[in-house]
């Protein structure tokens, strides 16, 4: 069966991340139909009302409604932001056992509707839950996408832009690996205007930037309870790449099948994104140190996968 076309989106989970994502979609005019699904019906219906009052000032018309899993039947994209929340001091990987069980139920209900589109997963630990979504759905790997390191990469580019006194949009570089503590910056390919950035920074400064990227979520959670604006905007960017068939490179969570020497793991890597999902993984030329760190990140995730699916 051909993949579902159109631009209807079903959002499962209207907490801080989900509602921020819905707001970003509306403000950017990415879709003309959005269905909100949440166990807390009153909260979701409140979001629907609030968002509909904003459409008057949005760039394009958009139909926003409360719905159910049945609405996934003809959806082009289902975005999952539902799950147990991350608590202060708790790592993303601490969440895994709680959220895999939740996802088995969510994905099962979505597939029962006849859904034949693309999944975009944002709930943490996102690499494990994207893998779980792929397992539970039975869909081809290219049609199950995790948010991967799209947010970590944004943080990296922002900090590099601050350091280089340049717009972050002019900085090119990636964080790859787990969306979590074992992630790594790819200094060997970070550039501005085609010029390598790494030689212009001390080892201490590079370490400081890497740590600030890695620890950003913990600092934000400690300060305000959760992170949501950054990831919501990143999800909107991935959504636009899918629905507009952009063939753009974004650092997302996708299944490796031999790329960079690894397989059977969902992990954050640059990939070409279009209307079919992940068209192709872009293999970065890593130096020996980066290869070693990436392998450790892969093993971190595989150890968790083994504990769940052994």
Curated annotation (Swiss-Prot):
Binding site for NAD(+): 17, 38, 43, 69, 83-84, 105, 122-124, 147
Binding positions (beta-D-fructose 1,6-bisphosphate): 157, 172
Reactions accelerated catalytically: (S)-lactate + NAD(+) = pyruvate + NADH + H(+)
EC number: 1.1.1.27
Location(s) in or outside the cell: Cytoplasm
Active site: 179 (proton acceptor)
Primary localization: cytoplasm
Activity regulation, per record: Allosterically activated by fructose 1,6-bisphosphate (FBP).
Family: Belongs to the LDH/MDH superfamily. LDH family.
Cross-referenced PANTHER family: L-2-HYDROXYCARBOXYLATE DEHYDROGENASE (NAD(P)(+)), L-LACTATE DEHYDROGENASE
UniProt function note: Catalyzes the conversion of lactate to pyruvate.
UniProt protein name: L-lactate dehydrogenase
